[in-house]
Amino acid sequence: MKKLNMEILSERWIIATFSFQGRQYNTKKTSQILPALFAVICAAFAGYFILIGSGMFTEPSVALILLATITILLLSSSKKSFYFILLPLTLLHAFYTPTGLNFGPPSYQYIASLFATDILETKEFLLQIPVSSYLIAFAIPILIFLQYKSAVKFGIKFYRNKTFIALATLLFAYNMPLAEPLKETVSSTLKIVDEVQKLKQISQSDNWGKSTLENSRYDDYVIVLGESARKDYHHAYGYPIENTPFMSNAKGTLIDGFRSAGTNTVASLRLMLTFPDKEKWEPNYSLSLVDLIKSAGIKTYWLSNHGMIGKFDTPVSSLASKSDETFFLKKGGSFNSTNFSDFDLLPKFAQVLENSVQGKRFIVLHIYGSHPMACDRIEDYPKIFDDKDLNPRYGYLNCYVSSIKKTDEFLKRVYDQLEENVKKNHRTFSMIYFSDHGLCHQQDEKTIYFCSIKTVSAESTIIFRYSKFHQMIWNAKNIRCLNQV
């Protein structure tokens, strides 16, 4: 009887033990629900921020966000995959996010700008990005770490859940675009490196052959390359603020509808200053404008307020180096953060004009114009309006329209020097001005600001003086004369 009772008690104890373990197992599963939900939410927000920060997915679909979330959770399942794969990719995306949110996905143009940017330009570029973009960038690695630490602490292993694996498999099979920003960055970087190598190889090449200049009226041909000047912010093009007194009153020809070849200096000028392949939208450095002019026996000069990292480090510096004489205000390229004024080019320009020379000359003046940040461009020039009389929202706009007026003043001074040279040395001239590209116009509740545009169809300011070069402009919409007698 005692033996039977002992067996019954033993059986009850075993059943009770199993029952207690079952309750303990269920309690453990319940305790993991909230941490798992927290990890999923963190991963989802991180995935969403990564997608919009890439610049390629401004409004990502729910499926795409789920795909990003699952990718993050899977890569977080292993310590090695987290630290050696997910974390580096996360930091790379976070680094690019401020740029991607405001200027679009990685491309040749932005990678080229990175190669050609000095410290001052980098500072000004970063300052024009809204604080909210930096907050999103900082949030990405924080969210990634939160979901990882939560999963580790509570022993959450998503890869063991069959439903999770099935959903992940279906989503991955459907679409896998997350690697596109990275692939585009690598592709653009390799393209830049390849282009630099080609620039070095063809630096001395010239496929124009011998050229002749017939029926030329002028002794000196001057081109002023502007910077970041939107057409619709010039009074000469109808803007109500009178910020172009010289352009609006000088005798010349105004081109309306000329479009920039790219969204930044390098992307634009490498096409505008060569004879490009219009089908592939690629430059032909062996057929450059400088080489064409030199082939006609004209002496060439390039005076620049832009930095020169190295003779062949960027397409623009390579094109400039083809000139017979070059002068750069910024010595040392990327390591020079001095904010030079465009007016600092004028003494060198006067020196070039005073030099005794036989034959014709071609002179390029590459100015900083209205390059962001525009307020830094006018440290030596008065603003059109007093800031205290304006709503703070229009503070940067005041700087921008004032920088255009400064460029107009620069053009007047160049013109006056050329006129003086006519009287002194009897050398006639042709003067041309155009901006390399425009800027996009954005605004929020607090301010109106400008940034690099995402498309290549950016209208730039074009003004031609005393020449018939408009015959070369195949995509101009309208040509009209200004103040002709």
From Swiss-Prot:
One GO CC annotation: plasma membrane
Membrane-crossing segments per the record: 33-53, 55-75, 81-101, 125-145
EC class of the enzyme, as a word: transferase
Record-level Gene Ontology MF annotations: phosphotransferase activity, phosphate group as acceptor
Localisation per UniProt entry: Cell membrane
Topological category with respect to the lipid bilayer: Multi-pass membrane protein
One Pfam family matching this protein: Sulfatase
Similarity section: Belongs to the phosphoethanolamine transferase family.
Protein name listed in UniProt: Putative phosphoethanolamine transferase HI_1064
High-level lineage: Bacteria, Pseudomonadati, Pseudomonadota, Gammaproteobacteria, Pasteurellales
